[in-house]
């Protein structure tokens, strides 16, 4: 059975892990470590010559190719948003699939075997649409997503693997684009989520934007130039702001130095600005304060007080910032745990859950919850809840509804997710119609609506007329979710990208081999001297010229053909040079043999017989 990997598909950084010898191990990125350590940046870039770059290579070229570079796409998952690059539109699922495909390739290179299955983490506060979109992205990338689990839950798995005894923990997960606060109880191998709260539009990127706004405004005051009108300057500045934020986690001040950031009539302008940790902390105060509500909500939903919490685990890159750690400590009144890497623990926890599903890990039971209430729209535009938020999943709940008008022969089921009393204020997950209800006065027919949430947190709904036993079932899909046909089309497109990548790699390797062949052949011609006949030289030089002409074109097969022609031309000269060298060595050896006597007398040597049996 092939390995199931665990994937942390993040807004700013992504990582993956796998169980090796029962322990979660981070899968190294092909490019090595980056700003995120073993995690790699969640960047995807399309170049004008048709290449697709993912991770660190995409981030490095973002300054020179801002219009072709995409980052932070996770915030758009589960929406109808499309990003347009060089005239072509891409869905968030397609962009995320490129990141997942890179992870798949890195994992296969690391493990030396095919990887086809994965557990992918999502923010606990992701709704049904966002979870479905994540599964679709995995499918496009060629992965069977065997489970979707919540990021804080995964972090707790990584933290609690070696911990004994019962304890209540708070997982404060502040990532690049989302905040999740989860209260869990752990003990005897059982990880039970008691409540979860959060904000899917709050994270480290908001901190970057605060710093960015400050720098842009200060530069405008000093020079009169608004850098927001310059796309390339903003890309340079955005990257510098992120680096400065990271550096200020371990330093009291840092300098942003960007020469030639822009120019006006008076000439080029340079940006050189010192940022202190105190200034950054001042700028992000409003972001930190937005974290307070979800923390208090999670405690309230779990019916616990701050003093009931035994441990606080911090997850996500921004939690490395002293200001974030101090804020959580101030709100909760206790220190935070230091024994877990905030950038790696989610992927490691996903790998542990993968191990549970594969049967590699025993005695662990994960009880997660649904983050938002689920219900249907009823008469008057009211949302009637069937499943309350923070209900342990998987779960199933049924409720009887009836008709609102006389002789009504069909009912539309409008499925909703959220906490607002009016249907229009909640997230619409989908609609379907149950038909064939016998005409009857209103209030007489009995329609049983059943909500069934699976272990991935994905909803299945059915409606059944109890009189006729007619039933309609659907797996909820958002109106803008990709259809099965669209997903299959995206899978084929992804395969074409993989084929194109392989073709480009073959072309690069062939060109390198051709360049090397030309170099070694020209070196051989110089060393050959009079061994090479004029005819041989002419034939080889002509073959070199033809190969150079082929290299100036784009036909790989033509390059290979001309390489073969040059190799054949070189073969005859190589044989002649080898023969000359052999003759030279033979002559030298003969000279040595004739000098093995001393004064015309044979030199005798002592010898000892060795017994073959004891040798």
UniProtKB/Swiss-Prot annotation:
PROSITE patterns: HSP70_1, HSP70_2, HSP70_3. Acts as a chaperone. Belongs to the heat shock protein 70 family. Residues 579-615 are annotated as: Disordered. This is Chaperone protein DnaK. The gene is dnaK. InterPro entries: ATPase_NBD (IPR043129), Chaperone_DnaK (IPR012725), Heat_shock_70_CS (IPR018181), HSP70_C_sf (IPR029048), HSP70_peptide-bd_sf (IPR029047), Hsp_70_fam (IPR013126). Residues 581-600 have a biased composition (Low complexity). Residues 605-615 have a biased composition (Acidic residues).
């Amino acid at each position: 059975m092939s390995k199931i990997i665990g994937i942390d598909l993040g807004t700013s950084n992504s990582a993956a892990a796998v169980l090796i010898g029962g322990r979660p191990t981070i899968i190294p990125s092909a490019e090595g470590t980056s700003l995120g350590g073993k995690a790699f940046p969640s960047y995807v870039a399309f170049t004008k010559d048709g290449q697709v770059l993912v991770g660190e290579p995409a981030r490095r070229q973002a300054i020179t190719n801002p219009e072709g570079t995409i980052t932070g796409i996770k915030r758009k998952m589960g929406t109808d948003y499309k990003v347009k690059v060089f005239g072509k539109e891409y869905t968030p699922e397609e962009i995320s699939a490129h990141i997942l495909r890179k992870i798949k390739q890195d994992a296969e290179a690391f493990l030396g075997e095919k990887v086809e299955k994965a557990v992918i983490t999502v923010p606990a506060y992701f709704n049904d649409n966002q979870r479905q979109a994540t599964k679709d992205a995995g499918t496009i990338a060629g992965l069977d997503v065997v489970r979707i689990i919540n990021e804080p839950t995964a972090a707790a798995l990584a933290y609690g693997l070696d911990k004994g005894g019962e304890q209540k923990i708070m997982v404060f997960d502040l990532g690049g684009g989302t905040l999740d606060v989860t209260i869990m109880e752990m003990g005897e191998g059982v990880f039970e989520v008691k409540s979860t709260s959060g904000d899917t539009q709050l994270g480290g990127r908001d901190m970057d934007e605060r710093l960015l706004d400050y720098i842009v405004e200060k530069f405008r005051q000093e020079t009169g130039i608004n850098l927001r009108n310059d796309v390339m300057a903003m890309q340079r500045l955005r990257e510098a702001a992120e680096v400065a934020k990271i550096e200020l986690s371990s330093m009291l001040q840092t300098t942003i130095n960007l020469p030639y950031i822009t120019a006006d009539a008076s000439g080029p302008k340079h940006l050189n600005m010192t940022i202190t940790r105190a200034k950054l902390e001042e700028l992000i105060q409003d972001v930190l304060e937005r974290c307070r509500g979800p923390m208090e909500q999670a405690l309230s939903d779990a019916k616990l007080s701050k003093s009931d919490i035994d441990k606080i685990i911090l997850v996500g890159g921004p939690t490395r910032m002293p200001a974030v750690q101090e804020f959580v400590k101030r709100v909760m009144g206790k220190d935070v745990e230091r024994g877990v890497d905030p950038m790696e623990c989610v992927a490691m926890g996903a790998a542990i859950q993968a191990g549970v599903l594969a049967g590699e890990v025993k005695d662990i039971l994960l009880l997660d919850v649904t983050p938002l209430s689920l219900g249907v729209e009823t008469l008057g535009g009211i949302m009637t809840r069937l499943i309350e938020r923070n209900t342990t999943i998987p779960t199933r709940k049924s409720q009887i509804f009836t008709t609102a008008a006389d002789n009504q022969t069909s009912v539309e089921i409008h499925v909703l997710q959220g906490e607002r009393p009016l249907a229009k204020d909640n997230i619409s997950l989908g609609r379907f119609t149950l038909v064939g209800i016998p005409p009857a006065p209103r209030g007489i027919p009995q329609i049983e609506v059943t909500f069934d949430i699976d272990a991935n947190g994905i909803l299945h709904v059915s409606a059944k007329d109890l009189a006729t036993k007619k039933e309609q079932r659907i797996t909820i899909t958002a109106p803008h979710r990709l259809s099965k046909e669209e997903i299959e089309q995206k899978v084929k497109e992804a395969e074409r990208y993989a084929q194109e990548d392989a073709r480009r790699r073959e072309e690069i390797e062939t060109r390198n081999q051709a360049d090397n062949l030309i170099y070694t052949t020209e070196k051989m011609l110089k060393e050959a001297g009079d061994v090479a006949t004029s005819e041989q030289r002419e034939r080889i030089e002509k073959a070199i010229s033809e190969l150079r002409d082929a290299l100036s074109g784009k036909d790989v097969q033509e390059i290979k053909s001309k390489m073969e022609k040059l190799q054949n031309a070189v073969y005859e000269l190589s044989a002649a040079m080898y023969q000359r060298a052999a003759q030279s060595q033979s002559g030298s050896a003969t000279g040595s043999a004739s000098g093995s006597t001393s004064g015309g007398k044979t030199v005798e040597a002592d010898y000892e017989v060795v017994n073959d049996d004891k040798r």
